[in-house]
């Protein structure tokens, strides 16, 4: 069994430029691994001046912003490989996240095109997502209601209906991938005690999944 030592963890901060000596890990610690990884054998300098690496880091920190005629301003979050922005969805502001490969601009274009198809036909998609979520989760909402000791509403005599469920959930975020898959996140209006309602599908196959998240 591999022995994991705590010594050294937390020694390096994020984006620290340093000079290290590295070597292949000993075979005895890599018996169950496909390939022998590398490990640090010595910290030569904990803080190193390196113009080449500093230039790369400076370039990394430059904001990447796209102006789209439909989606508005989108800013790349390089830590999460996603463009973030806000769109108008059925008259309300909704957060938009485009999942991309930060190093592949074609993926940016595909994700934008997929999102624009979704946004352009938003009324149809909005109804489809709400109806699907209501069909699949209204029963669960009534189950939660029956366990809510603070609610005066009795799910036996005054249950939450699918129509009510569809109207109560509030869209807060839409995430879209280059392949046309998307996930919508809804505020649950406290039907699930603060959990988000997650609805996902694709432009090709339609809505395929609804559940709770968070």
Give a label for each model feature.
Residues 2-4:
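Short, small-residue-biased leader/transition segments that mark boundaries at the very start
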Residues 10-34:
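Flexible glycine-rich surface loops and low-complexity tracts that mediate binding to linear polymers
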Residues 21-23, 77, 88-90, 97-101, ...:
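A structural detector for beta-sheet-dominated domains
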Residues 36-67:
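Short peripheral tails and domain-boundary helices/loops at the edges of structured domains
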Residues 59-128:
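Contiguous hydrophobic, core-forming segments of folded domains
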Residues 161-214:
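C-terminal structured interaction module
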